[in-house]
From Swiss-Prot:
Stated role: Responsible for the transport of dicarboxylates such as succinate, fumarate, and malate from the periplasm across the membrane.
Gene it is expressed from: dctA
Record family assignment: Belongs to the dicarboxylate/amino acid:cation symporter (DAACS) (TC 2.A.23) family.
Signal peptide region: none
The protein's name: C4-dicarboxylate transport protein
Organism whose genome encodes this protein: Sphingopyxis alaskensis (strain DSM 13593 / LMG 18877 / RB2256) (Sphingomonas alaskensis)
Length: 446
């Protein structure tokens, strides 16, 4: 007599991938190739700028839809509980404010101790103010009122087409809340959006395959245009900034990670492909869609990731904050301006406001610094010309520090809100694949 017996078959282990097929290996190789090409054939390197620009545009093309789908479906799936939503936002902003302010203070303290600009004795009248005029113009446009009003889009659709992260987040929150209160039609739309979200994250995976090309072009352009030699002129400032950022990540953020139950080094290793992409393109936005996907795989609740990460890209820029106070004091020291304690406190307070809303794109930190110096009269804005030539080399460090800070913030807030699967986080950070469900096998027996 035949009988059907279900036997649980062990999942077939995946074949190990070749080492060269990993994205982080390809991006690292592309960065090295870009540096070599830009150094030995600078004319060719500068012509490759469209490769980097094109890749960043490809990624920015899908950022707004990814944020909208992640946040809207996340809020709708938890029933649009405004109390829970407000609690997440409140905790996230408390975290952002504390660590952003701490980063500003760290930059200020290091600048006073190391004094990278001391002894340069530069006459402000000899500086080329015209070289920074465009940054000053943009800085004067960046008022707090204009920033807050700009969060509200002209139309619902324009929030998804004009590339503004905060506008996309704003309409996603409203749409998610409306969806959660729409009853059965809302549940049907939610199901559809979840399917569309799967398609978009598949698109993210496709676009990431072009990351090595973008990193190669961006790095070849940077080295070809500015040259490695330009680093030597202001080497102390660059070294001070890099070491300060490293200290902030390893010691301060590392302590936060430790008390949250995981290692900052494991987190960095988990995000190595994204970090190399940020390094190559000098833009933390380039890896935003991939970061959202990886944090969800690491056990962070979808609504929390969708809220914390996009807002962090405007309000939690640790690298930019370190850079602002460090660079401002460097300029003051270089031109012989002795800032009193009161002046430095005023600088700190202004930077706390002007740093909010600095987008995670290349050059935004420089514009934000221009805005800060425009408000603080003690430091000449023309002094920006001193660091204009090397800002591009510090941009990578700003972006990397910002990126790590936002990844950590999402995990910490998820832990506070009990929206963190710690087993999934441990597996992800250890490099272990997610467990596969065993498949039943039907067999006939006589």
């Amino acid at each position: 007599m035949a009988a059907n017996v279900n036997v649980m078959a062990a999942p077939t282990p995946a074949r190990p991938r070749a080492w060269w097929s990993h994205l982080y290996v390809q991006v690292l190789a592309a960065i090295v190739a870009g540096v070599l090409l830009g150094h030995f054939w600078p004319a060719i390197g500068t012509e490759l700028k469209p490769l980097g620009d094109g890749f960043i545009k490809l990624v920015k093309m899908i950022i707004a839809p990814v944020i909208f789908l992640t946040v809207a479906t996340g809020i709708a799936s938890i029933g649009g509980e405004t109390k829970a939503l407000g609690r997440v936002v409140g905790k996230a902003f408390a975290y952002f404010l504390f660590f952003s302010t701490l980063a500003l203070i760290v930059g200020l303290v290091v600048a006073n101790v190391v004094q990278p600009g001391a002894g340069m004795n530069i006459d402000p009248a000899t500086l080329d103010a015209g070289a920074v005029a465009q940054y000053q113009a943009k800085a004067h446009e960046a008022t707090l009122t204009a920033f807050l009003l700009d969060i509200i889009p002209v139309t619902f659709v324009s929030a998804l087409t004009e590339g503004s992260i905060l506008q996309a987040l704003f309409v996603a929150i409203l749409f998610g809340l409306a969806l959660s209160h729409a009853g059965e039609p809302g549940r049907q739309v939610l199901g559809l959006l979840e399917k569309v979200s799967t398609v978009f994250f598949g698109l993210v995976g496709m676009l990431m395959k072009f990351a090595p090309i973008g990193a190669f072009g961006a790095m070849a352009f940077t080295i070809g245009k500015y040259g490695v030699e330009s680093l030597a002129n202001l080497g102390l400032l660059i070294a001070t900034f890099y070491l300060t950022s490293l200290f902030f990540v390893i010691v301060i953020l590392g302590a936060v990670a430790h008390f949250s139950g995981f290692s900052i080094f494991r987190l960095i290793a988990y995000l190595k492909a994204e970090l190399l992409l940020v390094l190559g393109t000098s833009s933390s936005e380039a890896a935003l869609p991939s970061l959202i996907e990886k944090l969800e795989k690491a056990g962070c609740a979808k609504p929390i990731v969708g809220l914390v990460v996009p807002t962090g890209y405007s309000f939690n820029l640790d690298g930019t904050n370190i850079y602002m106070t460090l660079a401002a004091l460097f300029i003051a020291q270089a031109v012989g301006v002795d800032l009193s304690l009161g002046d430095q406190i005023a600088l700190l307070l202004v930077a706390m406001v002007s740093s909010k809303g600095a987008a995670g794109v290349t050059g935004a930190g420089f514009i934000t610094l221009a805005a800060t110096l425009s408000i603080v009269p003690s430091v000449p804005v023309a002094g920006l010309a001193l660091i204009l030539g090397i800002d591009r080399f510090m941009s990578e460090c700003r972006a990397l520090t910002n990126f790590i800070g936002n990844a950590l913030a999402a995990i910490v807030v998820a832990g506070w809100e009990k929206g963190l699967d710690r087993e999934a986080l441990a597996r992800a950070l250890a490099g272990e694949p997610a467990p596969l469900a065993a498949a039943p096998i039907e067999t006939d027996t006589d």
